[in-house]
Amino acid sequence: MVVALSFPEADPAMSPPSAPELHQDEAQVVEELAANGKHSLSWESPQGPGCGLQNTGNSCYLNAALQCLTHTPPLADYMLSQEHSQTCCSPEGCKMCAMEAHVTQSLLHTHSGDVMKPSQNLTSAFHKRKQEDAHEFLMFTLETMHESCLQVHRQSEPTSEDSSPIHDIFGGWWRSQIKCHHCQGTSYSYDPFLDIPLDISSVQSVKQALQDTEKAEELCGENSYYCGRCRQKKPASKTLKLYSAPKVLMLVLKRFSGSMGKKLDRKVSYPEFLDLKPYLSQPTGGPLPYALYAVLVHEGATCHSGHYFCCVKAGHGKWYKMDDTKVTSCDVTSVLNENAYVLFYVQQNDLKKGSINMPEGRIHEVLDAKYQLKKSGEKKHNKSPCTEDAGEPCENREKRSSKETSLGEGKVLQEQDHQKAGQKQENTKLTPQEQNHEKGGQNLRNTEGELDRLSGAIVVYQPICTAN
């Protein structure tokens, strides 16, 4: 189960900025696309970078974050398809609709020098005209977009699971294995994530930091593990592995710490291409390749000062530095030498996606600046059901075999256990592994409390045979 946070709503009265005008030749292309009823977008096509963004006052952090999201291939594909706005019944203040308008304006108006102002529907609930942490804004934006999707899904199908395009694109699962040193019993818990914070305090590369997340952590003394089999705290070892890899991988280099956001300013190398297969709990088949497409950079002593910008890879394969209104070309060598804060990788299969179907007549609508204002007073009532297969019921925990339980079965088991116990997840204390990221990320290897009883985690026990 994915735990989504609640955030203050943006002011629905705020209207998004007007779009730049189309040139005559571009308008002709739009006419042809509308006639065909299909708008093609491929990251292999000569698609240039998005517009520069105005700095409205200490807003470089959100500009850099928005540029990284705008140039995320699977997210851009989904936004340009206009799928969400066609089923959204409450476009006023909807973060998905606001992001959809932002991405559409930015990517469909890419003449040199084009500049747009980020919609206040996207920024007003977070931005208070002072410098903030770009990573925090990223997570805030993704969670509010996720919640907007859930509202549409709940209205169309109240029994659907808490899944959304945001978690389909950015979401993955950790598998935590804990082995009791006393009875040798093993338990597994599965935790969702949208990004992976990396401890860089003692590493020189991102690969080393990823390897460190897999190192076994010894749970002993006051931090001993409560073993459900032994029914008391016992020494144990804990290891983390990726159970399910996301389409888009966000790696957060933990540069900031403490309430003042003091920065760890050290050079950490990162590759243009990354294979995640070695970090999977059940690696099968060939490599799992990822390609770097965006790098978010911070210059300064703390997260509350200095300057943010980013480098992004456009659809035609060229790199650009996006620094507020300035959009300048750069090469991959300079990109790999940046002092990165957040790295964005996309599975190469998703990088080479084909075209997007767009209904006939939608091209003019999304390019019309009045469309943005019209949406705020318009409610659409067509709904498309969103259902998920929850899987077949499983046997009770006492009858489980020693064979590892699947993730789908684990979800059902957890729901049955919660129903029997009458528990509510919001009343269960969360461990640091499940709590939202604080500044600079969290240490995923830090463990407190009884991990068998994690809220939001799916716990699967693997009993062992004992001699009489």
Curated annotation (Swiss-Prot):
The active site is at 60 (nucleophile), 307 (proton acceptor). The keyword Acetylation does not apply. This is Ubiquitin carboxyl-terminal hydrolase 17-like protein B. GO terms for biological process: protein deubiquitination; proteolysis. It catalyses: Thiol-dependent hydrolysis of ester, thioester, amide, peptide and isopeptide bonds formed by the C-terminal Gly of ubiquitin (a 76-residue protein attached to proteins as an intracellular targeting signal). Keywords: Hydrolase, Protease, Thiol protease, Ubl conjugation, Ubl conjugation pathway. The gene is Usp17lb. Residues 422-434 have a biased composition (Polar residues). It comes from the Eukaryota. Ubiquitinated. Transmembrane segments: none annotated. The keyword Metal-binding does not apply.
